[in-house]
Each structure stands twice: as structure tokens, then as C-alpha cells.
Amino acid sequence: MVMLQSPAQKASDSASAQNTAVGGLMSPNSNPDSPKSNTSPDVASADSVVSGTGGGSTPPAAKIPKFIISANGAAVAGKQEQELRYSLERLKQMSSESGSLLSRLSPLQEDSQDKEKPNHNNNNSLTNHNANSNTRRSQSPPASVGSVSFSSPAQQRKLLELNAVRHLARPEPLQHPHAALLQQHPHLLQNPQFLAAAQQHMHHHQHQHHQHPAHPHSHQHPHPHPHPHPHPHPSAVFHLRAPSSSSTAPPSPATSPLSPPTSPAMHSDQQMSPPIAPPQNPPHSSQPPQQQQVAAPSDMDLERIKLVAAVAARTTQASSTSALASASNSVSNASISISNSSSGSPSGRDLSDYGFRIQLGGLAAAAAAAAATSRQIAAATYARSDTSEELNVDGNDEDSNDGSHSTPSVCPVDLTRSVNSSAAANPSSASTSASSDRDAATKRLAFSVENILDPNKFTGNKLPSGPFGHPRQWSYERDEEMQERLDDDQSEDMSAQDLNDMDQDDMCDDGSDIDDPSSETDSKKGGSRNGDGKSGGGGGGGSKPRRARTAFTYEQLVSLENKFKTTRYLSVCERLNLALSLSLTETQVKIWFQNRRTKWKKQNPGMDVNSPTIPPPGGGSFGPGAYASGLLYSHAVPYPPYGPYFHPLGAHHLSHSHS
């Protein structure tokens, strides 16, 4: 079919040749010069694709492959190959441009173009894998849209096979419906299942193209025929190509997604998706390109690639999916394309099986995961699983109306995509895929949240923070991070010295033996690390996830305990000296004192923490060391205000009062 011809012009040329060679197979709709055969890579391609898609709507146009291969095969093959390379490059550019071009176009246009593009690209890839890369210039059977309707699927298959072989020979041009997919997943070219599916898709898609004789016009022209594509549509596979097509087609604003369900974009999607049940595609033709709007051009591309795989899986379930797709027309453009594949082929022909295999071979897993809808795929891709699910669910509900694939709303989602292996469970698949997408999104979110909440990630503790899976993890972690920021220095230095035990003791030493370092150690180790993070944070220590404790040595604990007996608050100088003497960081010492004060407070509920257990050697609690410790280190104790840090020695009293 013209689709084989690489350029839109070639499409028209081949359309004319097809008119002669195919012997009037070309429908009157197909015009060599019709927009469908436009040479413009974007608009012409889109038009050609649309017209090609719509042009052959009447007959299967199975003759096209034969004719194209025979009549246009040699010249067109060369041209298409060139065009394919160009189109693939063009599609790549258009893929990048498609976002802008599609965005330029009305969202509906973008989507419809995207959808059409996938269809056109898919159609072209079906008819011409080489031409397909023509950015759908000749992808659509421009001339053959109306005039060329291949009655024999065999011819189309021949053409598809040639195209498939061509795209296999030249993975780059990949007029293949899966051109985009293949570009990203070149290994699919070596996948016999994928290739077979692609070929069948091409055959079906050729039928689709022929089934759109009314779409010689640009995509904008609504497909007057409801895409009664009796031909199986390999659309599922084409959706892979769809992203390229969408990037290619955007220039044809005529294909505004607003166009009625007959809009070529929708029809292209329908054609592409109905490769399994082309006869049911006509209902899809009613699907408005607006649904195509749903997916953004870029999303459409991503989704289409996934959709192609998903469509393959869906196509497996295409019979139910086609109804689902038509029902869920609004779901998403990408999902429309997929649903077109599935809804267009409600019968779930081998193409769907192929599509499924293709999914399995290439994007199968991803497509299966995103199987619910193209939007669901997008949801899976973009964590939009909820919306996609809803759309999919709707599509699934409609999908139950398998015959309702004609329903304008194209549930672009084949539930089977989420469940690749389940080719028949469309509604359940859609739901499953929706739920799977949702679960996946949830898992991702949970994972992200867990990462964010993971105290180990942000505490900077050398030691593992321990399991922070508690629901209170946030508050604890914040508290603990506060602690750990203080303790981390301890932990780091102490961990270097293997001070975990000491830190545990120290940190846990919230409340027992103040004076006895060993008992303190025991209490620390045994006691909850209440004072750990927040010297007054006792109580949360046991329940909240614990930061890895600084392991204080017994000597360190004894020294710290003795110092604590002397003064419960260390001055900056004292803390520094003590840290240096104990080979600890000031933060570790500070945190230890905070925890120790907390423990002491617990042990001595009514007593002033600031009152030194033992009068400082300098002369009682008011010794300069005591003052400094109280003043400067009162901050270490959460209870005393931080002001004492900066207070003069007199602040020692303040710090005591603070406590």
C-alpha cells in the first residue's frame, strides 16, 4: 500500500501506481495529491498517514503489499529506505519537535496527531516500514487511502513482510510500526515474534489505512468512515512506531484532535490498535481525536512506545480491549492508540498475540506493567497510575462491551498490557494494570519517602542508623538527627574508636547511675537512649529508631562520668579539652553530657541539673570550670536555655536556673 512508499509524495505516486497496478484498488478517496500524500514530513506525513489510514477503510486492501511491492516496490523501496532514514531522523527530530509541534497544535491536535502519527507511522510502517520512517509522509497510503484498499490480506502481509524485512535490514529507517520502539529497542528487530507481530501489524495496518479512504486529508479531517476495519490491525505493534509518527505528524494541525471520532488521528489510532479486529475499528473511528489530546505529545511518544508493547499485549486481548479502548476513548491519546489497537481488533487477532509477544520481546514487561491504558502506561511512566487506572477502569467497563469498541471513547488501555500474559482479561487487566501502576507508583513513593526518611541518608552517621521504619520516624528522625548531628560527631570519632558501646551507654545513660561510670554505662546501654538526641529526649529513645550509637570506651565513660560529677555543663574549653583528652569530638562529648544530664534528671527529678554532683575542683559548683561548663555547656542540655552558652561565668547560675 502507499504506506510502503517512503515519502508522502511517493505515497501519492504509489497511490497512482497502485491505482494502476492494483487495478483501481485505490479508493476514489485516495488522491495521489491529496493531503495524505503531502510531502511535508509533518503535515504531509500526517495527512498521508491519515488519508492512508482512512483511505483504505473499505477493503482490507490486502493487494497493496503486492502492488506496492511489485509496482512501487523497487523505486518506492529505495525511496522509502532513503525516506525511512530521513524519516527516522525526521522522526527523531520530530519526536523532539513533536512536543513543541504538538504543543503548538491544539492539545487535541497534538494528541490526534500523535495518535494519528502512531497510526500513520504504524500504518506506514505496516505498509512501508521504510516509508514509515518518512515521518508518515508516505506512511499513510496517500493515494491508496481511498483508491487502494487491498482486498487480500496476503498482499498486505507481503508488503508488511517487505516492510518488516526492510526495517529489519535497516533498523534505522524502521518504517516499521515499531520504528520508535525498535529505535529504542533495536534488539526487537531480532525478535522473530516482534517481527512477525510487526508484519501482521503492518498487514492489519495496511487494512486500516485502506479502511480510511475518507482520510486522504490531513489528520484534521475526521474519518468519515467509522474505521470499519475488517482487517486485523497490527496497531499494537505500531504504537511503538506511534511515538515517531506522532513526532512526525504534529505539523498537520488539520488533524486536530477535535475532529470527530472519524478524525484521522483517532482513526489512525484505531487503525493502529485494531490490527487485531479491524472490523471493529470503525467504532474506533468514531473515537474523537480529543481522546488523543489526553496524552501530551511527549507523553504520547513515551506512552506509545510503551503502548506499542502494551498494545501488543493488549492486542492479544484486543477483542475485549477494543471495546475497552473505544469506551475509554477519553482515557488518553496514547491509551486511545493502544485501545484502538485492542478495540480496533476486538477479535484479539494474532496481531494482538504478536503485539503481546512483542511486548514480551521488547517493551513487554514495561508495556505489561503499563498495560491498563496508554495513559495508564503514562501513569506508570509518570506515576499517573490513578488517572490512568480510572480511565482504564472505565475503558474496562466499556471493554466488557467488547462490541462497543466502536464507542468513541477509546480505552487506549489494554488491561492485558499490565498483564502481558493475560491476553483475554481486558477489564481485569486494565484494573490490574491500573492497580499495578498505582502500586508501582505507591512503591516508588514509598521508596522515595523511605529514602527521604532514612536517617542514615541524612544523619551523616558513620554507624548505621538502624531500622527507621517506624511511622514516627519523621519526628524521631528529626529529633534523632538533632541528636545525631550532635552525636554524629561523637559517633564519627567514637565510631573510629569503636565507641559504640560507650555511645550506647552514654546515649542510653539517660537516667541511671550518674556517678558510677560503669553503672552509667550499664544504664546507658540498658536504658533507652532518651537523652541521646535531645539530652532531654528521653522517652523517645527507646521507641524511636535509634541512630548508631557512639561506642565510648570504658575509660572515656569513666572520664566523662567523672567530669559530669564535677560539672553537669561543660564550658566550650572544657568540652574541647575533654574531647581531646578522650579522643572524642566535642559534639560527642556534648551529646554525652546532654544524655547524661537527661539521665541525671531522671534519676534526680527535683534537682537542679546545673548543681554539680561534685563541687568543681576550682571551688564548688561555682568554680570557673563549673561556670564555664554551666554557661557554655548548658546548651548541651536541652533543658537549660542556650543563652548560658554565651553568658559570662555568672551565667553558670543562669544555666542552673535554666535547668
Swiss-Prot record:
Biased composition regions of type Gly residues, renumbered to the chain: 528-543
UniProt entry keywords in alphabetical sequence: Developmental protein, DNA-binding, Homeobox, Nucleus, Repeat
UniProt keyword annotation of DNA-binding present: yes
Bias (Low complexity) ranges: 27-51, 95-108, 120-135, 287-298, 316-347, 417-435
GO BP term (any one): muscle organ development
Compositionally biased spans, kind Basic residues: 201-232
PROSITE patterns: HOMEOBOX_1, HOMEOBOX_2
Record flagged with keyword rRNA-binding: no
Sequence repeat copies, ranges: 221-222, 223-224, 225-226, 227-228, 229-230, 231-232, 233-234
CDD domains: homeodomain (cd00086)
GO cellular component: nucleus
Annotated spans, Disordered: 1-63, 94-152, 198-298, 316-349, 376-440, 455-548
Principal location class: nucleus
Composition skew (Pro residues), residue ranges: 250-263, 275-286
Polar residues: compositionally biased ranges: 1-21, 136-152
GO molecular function per UniProt: DNA-binding transcription factor activity, RNA polymerase II-specific; RNA polymerase II cis-regulatory region sequence-specific DNA binding
Database matches in Gene3D superfamilies: Homeodomain-like
Family designation: Belongs to the NK-1 homeobox family.
PANTHER family: HOMEOBOX PROTEIN NKX, HOMEOBOX PROTEIN SLOU
Function statement: May play a role in specifying the identity of particular somatic muscles and neurons of the CNS.
Record-given protein name: Homeobox protein slou
Gene from which this protein is expressed: slou
